Every structure is written in structure tokens, then in C-alpha cells.
Amino acid sequence: GDVSDLSVGLTTATGRPTSVITGVVRPVPLEYSWSMKPDHEAIEELVADQKAPVYIVHPSQKQAVERAQSMTSMKLVSTEERHAIAAEIAGFRFAKGFGSTVRKFITAGIGIHHAGMLPKYRRLIETLAQQGKLKVICGTDTLGVGINVPIRTVMFTSLTKFDGRRTRVLKSREFHQIAGRAGRAGFDT
């Protein structure tokens, strides 16, 4: 769609030039939108409107975990879905500490995914997401690179990231790489 109003609004709000990328051909076209709704409200609406799984991209691992924690009281999955998740993870060994936190998130239909996690937890989240058992995945840009997981909606909490030295604005290519996790051919057609 026409994003010229969004481009002008971003330039006005940030004082920085905005680039509009056009002409990208995708097997599953993406829709872009901007919302000022509180995040919890937006997430509940996306799940209710069958736009889950939602991948919520955070600039830091800490923010991803905090967001997942804040959503555990939301009713994202039905009782039947919760039982299906419990059956799927019944034989999985969660360590104490962060492992029990991951388990709590998963049973609420929430995944967490970032580079600081043990690979076994990241693989579990990826497997559950591929099975359609998770409604929301909170993470950094790690899920946005090289992993084929069915994501219907990508929600950015910020258009910045820490690059190891400083926090900077995402490059257009990085934004499109992460946003492109939604609408994957073969998963969401």
C-alpha cells in the first residue's frame, strides 16, 4: 500500500530522512502498519484476529524476557492448546533458573528467542513455533536470520539495535530481513 504518509510522519517525528523501498517481489506480500496502541492491547488484538504467531522484536535480550514475563497473565492460548503444549514438552528437561522461566513462558503460549539462550531452548522454541503451538515469540533479531519458522506478524518494539558498540537505527536491509519472517512461502500462503 501507500506508505508516503508514514514516511513523512517518521521524518517529521525523528528529524531524519526516511527511505521508501518499492518494487520488492515476494511470494507472500507483506502488509505494513504503524500503531500507537499499547503493546498488550495490540498483541491481544492480533491474536484475536488470527494474526498469530506474532514475533515481537526487541532491541535487547533483557527487554525480550521482560516482555514475555509481562504477557504471562494474558490468555493467549485456550485450555486445550495449553494441554497440547504440556504434552509436547512433557519429556523435555528444563534446567533450574532460566529453564523454569522458559517453561513458564511456553505453557502460556509464549516463546523467547535470543542469542544468549542455550541452543536446546532455542531449538525447542523453533520446533513449537513450526508446530503452531506458540502465539507469541519475544526475541531479538536472532529469529530473523536463517530460520524458517511460520510467523504471521512481526511487531517491532523499536527500530534500533545494539551493534556491539552502540545503539543505532536499523538499516533498511536489516528491517526487511526481520520483517520478512512474516508470510513465508509454504507456511503462510
Model-derived segments and their meaning:
Residues 41-42, 124, 142, 174:
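Well-ordered alpha-helical segments embedded in enzymatic catalytic cores
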Residues 1-75, 104-115:
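Conserved interdomain linker/interface between the two RecA-like ATPase lobes of SF2 helicase motors
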